[in-house]
Amino acid sequence: MPPKRIAKRRSPPEDAIPKSKKVKVSHRSHNTEPGLVLTLGQGDVGQLGLGESVLERKKPALVPLLQDVVQAEAGGMHTVCLSQSGQVYSFGCNDEGALGRDTSVEGSEMVPGKVELQEKVVQVSAGDSHTAALTEDGRVFLWGSFRDNNGVIGLLEPMKKSMVPVQVQLDAPVVKVASGNDHLVMLTNDGDLYTLGCGEQGQLGRVPELFANRGGRQGLGRLLVPRCVLLKSRGTRGRVRFQDAFCGAYFTFAISREGHVYGFGLSNYHQLGTPGTGSCFIPQNLTSFKNSTKSWVGFSGGQHHTVCMDSEGKAYSLGRAEYGRLGLGEGAEEKSIPTLISRLPVVSSVACGASVGYAVSKDGRVFAWGMGTNYQLGTGQDEDAWSPVEMTGKQLENRVVLTVSSGGQHTVLLVKDQAQS
């Protein structure tokens, strides 16, 4: 009898508790189509994944060791890839732990290496020095660190970075993760937005300006403990629920279930579509995106500009214009409202790097524009492109482009052979 009593008292291990409630999460942002990974641009810290001898690529190059990849994301100086079987691979700068794996063997950060996670992952996101992974049952694992203007602020605990994945404690299952340079946004299946990381520019949407610098008197816990972005719903007692969220470097876009576009964070060049250039510390209902004929389906933000697309496959840009990053043609100036990029075919997705923009066309071609300095445009030259240029190269022949993602100095493409499409 006594052993039975002991057994009764024993509480189940923590990770076993939610099993009864486990759900398989889904969201339209989860990619399931497998492909090959191509990289281009600067790779001096291994972010191209091509080994120690390749520090630059002017045209897309095939990353070896990676097959059946369904998502390829460029962080600031690292790259994260998700395989069809739900495993995560990383390469690039690991100074702050953004790779989530041991890179003590010289050169091991320059080629793809597996991140040890027991769970099947369905989505990844990457910032300047952090990476997030969303599991099929809606849990989020995070590694690396967040920084502000004064340096490292920590990851989930003040001043502590993590070189390996740690679980983010949240009650609700998450369906999507998105990363800015130094903040993370998590969308739950209930339509709530949780944010954490640096809040200096308002990008968390829940920390007043007074406390945005290192959390004020409450300290960094205010920033690093994920909390919900609360926004009262007009005319009802409830709060606004969201269906999607996207990040720029220092700002966030969120689309409500009713289709309204909200934004918060840095808008010093009107990159949020706000009439003014002040930072927004609470979500703003962005009237510049109100148009009864359009629904907005995709956003991507660089350092000071935004590229977005509507449900008809048209691409638009707004924000800072230097170096041609808006793709609106020679001499274009700053835009405070979404402005049609007319020289593009129908697009299926858009993306931004720090000072560049991209669009993938419905028929699988990729177009690039903006700053040419880092060879991120795939033109083979370092000149800026003020209008979209179709990317070409040996590795793009007889292939269709599925997605594009861009970091500070490098760009990552997911492609597949034409015969398979």
Swiss-Prot record:
Processing after translation: N-terminal methylation by METTL11A/NTM1 is required for binding double-stranded DNA and stable chromatin association. Dimethylation produces a permanent positive charge on the amino group, which facilitates electrostatic binding to the phosphate groups on DNA, while inhibiting histone-binding. Methylated tail helps retain RCC1 on chromosomes during nucleotide exchange on Ran.
UniProt keyword Nucleus, yes or no: yes
Localisation: Nucleus; Chromosome; Cytoplasm
RCC1 repeat segments: 34-84, 85-136, 138-189, 191-257, 258-311, 312-362, 363-416
Domain of life: Eukaryota
GO molecular function: guanyl-nucleotide exchange factor activity; histone binding; nucleosomal DNA binding; protein heterodimerization activity; small GTPase binding; sulfate binding
Residues found modified as N-methylproline: 2
N,N-dimethylproline modifications at: 2
UniProt xrefs under InterPro entries: Ran_GTPase-activating, RCC1/BLIP-II, Reg_chr_condens
Purpose: Guanine-nucleotide releasing factor that promotes the exchange of Ran-bound GDP by GTP, and thereby plays an important role in RAN-mediated functions in nuclear import and mitosis. Contributes to the generation of high levels of chromosome-associated, GTP-bound RAN, which is important for mitotic spindle assembly and normal progress through mitosis. Via its role in maintaining high levels of GTP-bound RAN in the nucleus, contributes to the release of cargo proteins from importins after nuclear import. Involved in the regulation of onset of chromosome condensation in the S phase.
PANTHER family: REGULATOR OF CHROMOSOME CONDENSATION
Protein's name according to its UniProt entry: Regulator of chromosome condensation
Gene, per the UniProt record: Rcc1
